[in-house]
């Protein structure tokens, strides 16, 4: 919005000011997470003779040269190396600014989003979806802790949000797409169960083989019962090997 008495299309820096370093106050980190929408873009002529369009960085307020970048949705600041949106997000998307100043893009119906930076990994709760006009300032998200647990993957070591409220279940890591067990009680319990069932079925098969040999020579259908007993026992032992070899993932902090 233009100031009183100043045309919104007038240059931010007058031609008589020369090469002046922007004197905007330093960026102060807000506590609340913000869903960031780009301002309505207006090409602003720079003080040089070429009239190159520029825009202020949303993080450090430095001027960003937009020459040759007007087709992009976001541009990168050469001072702080952070991204600044210059166009509205694609249809069905929205911008979110993480407290570490990383600009993220997600679906406009998303409730949570994770920061991909290794030194942050923050889970951002976006709160209920609201349609915000572009002219309005960015609205802070609700400061609500996510309902779930941060879990360290047993395969890749990355942290992800696990939404189950009980332990000893399986979880799929969104980073490596592999399945692991949250806690070790469930795999051990199922491994012992399948070993017991497999050995029982194999012993039954051995008993049938020894005890019904003469009967099987007259009634060949008896061989089917042998095969079923051995097959069920083998399947149980294979499942026991699966549960015995599964990786364990452990929770970091619980917010539930």
Swiss-Prot record:
Keywords: Endosome, Hydrolase, Lipid metabolism, Lysosome, Membrane, Transmembrane, Transmembrane helix. Residues 1-10 have a biased composition (Basic and acidic residues). Catalyzes the hydrolysis of phosphatidylinositol-4,5-bisphosphate (PtdIns-4,5-P2) to phosphatidylinositol-4-phosphate (PtdIns-4-P). It comes from Xenopus laevis (African clawed frog). One of its GO terms (biological process) is phosphatidylinositol dephosphorylation. GO terms for molecular function: phosphatidylinositol-4,5-bisphosphate 4-phosphatase activity. The chain crosses the membrane at residues 191-211, 226-246. This is Type II phosphatidylinositol 4,5-bisphosphate 4-phosphatase. One of its GO terms (cellular component) is lysosomal membrane. The active site is at 106. Its EC number is 3.1.3.78. It is found in: Late endosome membrane; Lysosome membrane. Residues 1-25 are annotated as: Disordered. Residues 13-22 have a biased composition (Polar residues).
């Amino acid at each position: 919005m233009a100031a009183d008495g100043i045309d919104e299309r007038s240059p931010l820096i007058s031609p008589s000011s020369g090469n002046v370093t922007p004197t905007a106050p330093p960026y102060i980190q807000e506590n609340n997470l913000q869903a960031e929408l780009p301002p309505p873009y207006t090409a602003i002529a720079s003080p040089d003779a070429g009239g190159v369009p520029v825009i202020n960085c949303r993080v450090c307020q430095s001027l960003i040269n937009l020459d040759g970048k007007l087709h992009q949705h976001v541009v990168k600041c050469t001072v702080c190396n952070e991204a600044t949106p210059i166009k509205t997000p694609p249809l069905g998307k929205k911008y979110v600014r993480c407290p570490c100043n990383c600009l993220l893009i997600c679906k406009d119906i998303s409730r949570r989003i994770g920061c991909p930076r290794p030194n942050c990994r923050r889970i951002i709760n976006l709160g209920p979806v609201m349609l915000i006009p572009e002219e309005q300032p960015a609205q802070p998200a609700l400061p609500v802790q996510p309902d779930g647990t941060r879990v360290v993957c047993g395969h890749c070591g990355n942290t992800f949000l696990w939404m189950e409220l009980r332990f000893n279940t399986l979880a799929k890591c969104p980073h490596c797409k592999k399945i692991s067990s949250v806690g070790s009680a469930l795999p051990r319990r199922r491994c012992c169960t399948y070993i017991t069932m497999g050995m029982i079925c194999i012993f039954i098969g051995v008993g049938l083989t020894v005890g019904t040999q003469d009967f099987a020579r007259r009634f060949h259908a008896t061989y089917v019962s042998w095969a079923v007993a051995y097959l069920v026992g083998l399947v149980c032992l294979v499942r026991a090997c699966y549960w015995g070899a599964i990786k364990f993932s452990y929770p970091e902090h619980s917010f539930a």
